[in-house]
């Protein structure tokens, strides 16, 4: 497979931006202009190059708006939002860096300008009440409603009501990035979509200091409450056709949400089954087992990880980002937090239709360790109501979160969702 960078980490994150181009999240030429400016592993050069590209795209949007070209303006603003998001990504080893919040605020602001100019949908801002031990907060969300009419409906369904996808982010995504992964493909198919930023994600992490939590059903219960008590009363949403969708750690979160009886279908894309086991499998047995048995102290564990992180930028970023989103101070504490992120014993609560995907070529959540155990653990979902797909090759969905193959993923996902919701589309 062709690689833009020698390291898998920088290659994947560059491809993550570039692959959003068909959905409006990037322009190929703008991405290629960034490439020679960023040496492999150089987080500062990455930040500078993507920030400059974001500012340039935002400038193009301003110019288009002055001339009355709202289509060009919307596209430029949406690209700028994704570039601002990408710019700060590799700076997460220093959570106190003020550029993290500044870049995210720019990403959110310019994204709002972009989606408000779209003529394909109506975007409604949503606030989701959320409570945790440290106090109450409001999670930001966006409800996307297609303007071109509802999806074709099956027998017994009201034609003026829309099926709804609730899309959750994961470990390092943002609500704005989710637009390119979900709503951009769902809206033309007649689906309404609700995205939201949860604790430990996007602006909620950087501005509000909310931390990630393993019991994501606590979050999605609040989201579903808002859908049921507010959104379905004000907008044409069909409460009998609600699905949850997530990718990577978001796929794990989607599975947690799917235990709610108000959810009728779940799409879990390339999720983890046990996050600790995934991380454990990447460490020498003597080291991780020695720490688990307490023969090796936290101090020694932290010293070794920090020493190795000095040589490996990816390791430094993974533990740095983890400490930030979990709200802990050391690698050992990260490992303890990860032990809470597993689906073992939980998936028996899921009874709705479920589409489970895996990625054969990922270096994160491999199918053997994650996808297959998830599918097998869905014992209370009838076989005819669950489906398994393992993507292979970059063109066939073989990379994590189906990066580089969203069109293939969307085709399979929406055919399956249409079946679950009895949506009949005409043939040509």
UniProtKB/Swiss-Prot annotation:
Pathway: Secondary metabolite biosynthesis. Induction: Expression is positively regulated by the acurin A cluster-specific transcription regulator acrR. Disruption phenotype: Abolishes the production of acurin A. Gene3D superfamilies: acylaminoacyl peptidase, alpha/beta hydrolase. GO terms for molecular function: hydrolase activity. InterPro entries: AB_hydrolase_1, AB_hydrolase_fold, FrsA_esterase. Its EC number is 3.7.1.-. The active site is at residue 248. The keyword Hydrolase applies. It comes from the Eukaryota. Belongs to the AB hydrolase superfamily. FUS2 hydrolase family. PANTHER family: ALPHA_BETA HYDROLASE PSOB, DIENELACTONE HYDROLASE DOMAIN-CONTAINING PROTEIN-RELATED. Hydrolase; part of the cluster that mediates the biosynthesis of acurin A, a highly reduced polyketide coupled to a serine via a peptide bond. The activities of the highly reducing polyketide synthase acrA and the nonribosomal peptide synthetase acrB are collectively responsible for the synthesis of the acurin A core structure with a heptaketide backbone produced by acrA covalently fused to a L-serine by acrB. After the formation of the PK-NRP hybrid product, it is detached from acrB by reductive release to set up the formation of the lactam ring by aldol condensation. This is Hydrolase acrC.
């Amino acid at each position: 497979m062709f690689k833009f960078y020698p390291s898998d980490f920088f290659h994947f994150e560059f491809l993550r931006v570039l692959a959003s181009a068909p959905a409006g999240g990037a322009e190929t030429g703008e991405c290629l202009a960034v490439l020679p400016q960023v040496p492999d592993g150089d987080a500062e050069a990455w930040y500078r190059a993507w920030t400059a590209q974001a500012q340039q795209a935002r400038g193009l949007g301003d110019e288009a708006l002055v001339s009355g070209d709202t289509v060009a303006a919307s596209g430029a603003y949406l690209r700028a939002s994704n570039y601002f998001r990408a710019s700060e990504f590799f700076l997460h080893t220093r959570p106190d860096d003020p550029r993290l919040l500044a870049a995210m605020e720019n990403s959110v602001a310019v994204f709002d300008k972009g989606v408000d100019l779209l003529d394909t949908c109506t975007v409604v801002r949503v606030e989701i009440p959320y409570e945790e031990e440290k106090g109450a907060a409001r999670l930001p969300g966006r409800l996307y409603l297609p303007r071109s009419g509802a999806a074709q409906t099956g027998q017994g369904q009201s034609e003026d009501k829309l099926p709804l996808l609730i899309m959750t982010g994961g470990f390092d995504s943002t609500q704005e990035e989710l637009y390119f992964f979900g709503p951009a493909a769902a809206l033309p198919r007649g689906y309404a979509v609700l995205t939201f930023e949860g604790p430990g994600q996007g602006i909620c992490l950087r501005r509000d200091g909310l931390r990630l939590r393993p019991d994501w059903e606590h979050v999605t219960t609040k989201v579903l409450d808002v859908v049921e008590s507010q959104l379905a009363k004000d907008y044409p949403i069909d409460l009998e056709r609600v699905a949850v969708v997530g990718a990577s750690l978001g796929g794990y979160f989607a599975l947690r949400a799917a235990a709610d009886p108000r959810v009728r279908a779940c799409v879990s894309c390339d999720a983890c089954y046990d996050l600790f086991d995934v991380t454990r499998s990447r460490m020498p047995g003597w080291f991780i087992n020695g720490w688990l048995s307490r023969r090796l102290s936290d101090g020694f564990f932290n010293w070794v990880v920090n020493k190795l992180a000095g040589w490996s930028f990816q390791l430094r970023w993974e533990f740095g980002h983890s400490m930030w989103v979990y709200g802990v101070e050391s690698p050992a504490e990260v490992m303890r937090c990860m032990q809470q992120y597993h689906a073992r014993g939980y998936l028996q609560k899921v009874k709705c239709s479920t589409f489970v995907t895996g990625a054969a070529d990922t270096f994160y959540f491999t199918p053997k360790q994650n996808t297959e155990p998830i599918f097998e653990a869905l014992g209370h979902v009838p076989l005819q109501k669950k489906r398994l797909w393992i993507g292979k090759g970059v063109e066939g969905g073989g990379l994590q979160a189906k990066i580089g193959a969203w069109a293939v993923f969307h085709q399979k996902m929406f055919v399956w969702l249409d079946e679950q919701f009895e949506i009949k589309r005409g043939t040509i």
